[in-house]
Amino acid sequence: MLKYLSVILICFAITERSEAQKADAFTWWNPAGSAFPVIEGQAWPKEVKSPYDRLPARAEQTVRKDVWDLSRHSAGLYIKFRSNADEIRVRYGVTSKGNFGMPHMPATGVSGLDLYAVNHGGEWVWAPGLYHFSDTITYRYANIEVDRQFKGKDGEFRLFLPLYNAVSWMEIGVPAGKTFTPMPLSDEKPVVIYGTSIAQGGCASRPGMAWTAILERQLNCPLINLGFSGNGRLEKPLIDLMTEIDARIYVLDCLPNLVGTPDKGLENKIWESVKGLQAKRPSTPVLLVEHSLGAGSGIINAKRVEDCERSSKVLRQVFADLKKEGIKNIYLLSNAALGMDINSTVDGSHPTDLGMKQHADAYTKIIRQILH
């Protein structure tokens, strides 16, 4: 028995040493240590308290604590780089250790990564990864071939970061001798989205399946994700921060967190938010979004449907009143256009991957119409 255990321990030690040697054969890069900003999706890259935050450090004094804490989550952030590597590894830590997933959302979405690339035909391709969740989370993307016709050539990659966890540190590795070139931030104007848990990414199976990430790829332009789970409430400190961003369009998708607000209070919030944005950025379009659920969604919870319909009705009325007052450059995305049905959510609120794609397609269609 003792001999048997000794053999097992020796084999284990050899395996551990072999894995360590493989890791040593990789060249590792720390995005936070880059000579220039490389974390896309941040509106204030030089003002953040921690490298993977979404709001500037000064916002801690102006937004509610719940909003600030959620802003530490890396939802919507991604890193662009070029490489000819046939294997890419990522190792990183998150602040909520041991709490990697949620009952209605897998660890791969809450705390995981997602790697996409653009082939030489301009099409998006995706790399499945092997992952392990512990104090140090690891992802291994093997046998990468972005384009068979250009084997061994550099590919352009986008690594999407966790939706519902805060990244404390990260390193990206490629085999020694392979090329790896971080890409600078885009200088294009971003789409800026202020929303709820749905915008933050709940409950996508992986970060790249959040509707905001799908939208970013479909529009092929930068996107700032200001989605805060349970806390997308059209609050002035967030509206003021949004006006600091020279956006191509502002999106206000907060009704799911405002269904309990009395009609008059909801009217005021919508009205003041639109006026606040247009006072500072009069030429930037503002897209108002109805509640994603309604009578056509097939949900058989009468109270929930009634609340959703009521909030959307208030939004439609405010939209009409704003138009009557001569406010221009405002648009409305309807519940019907979002097209949610009985297959679209995990729990009657948060989208499945199918629901995320439905959201992204509806947004893509209307934003293209507005901007072109």
What are these regions (language model features)?
Residues 255-266, 301-309, 347-354:
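The substrate-binding groove and active-site-proximal loops of carbohydrate-active enzymes
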Residues 190-193, 222-226, 249-253, 285-289, ...:
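Structural recognition of the beta-strand scaffold that forms the well-ordered cores
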Residues 203, 215, 232-280, 291-298:
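Oxyanion-hole/transition-state-stabilizing segment in secreted/luminal serine hydrolases
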Residues 294-333:
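Substrate-gating cap/lid alpha-helix
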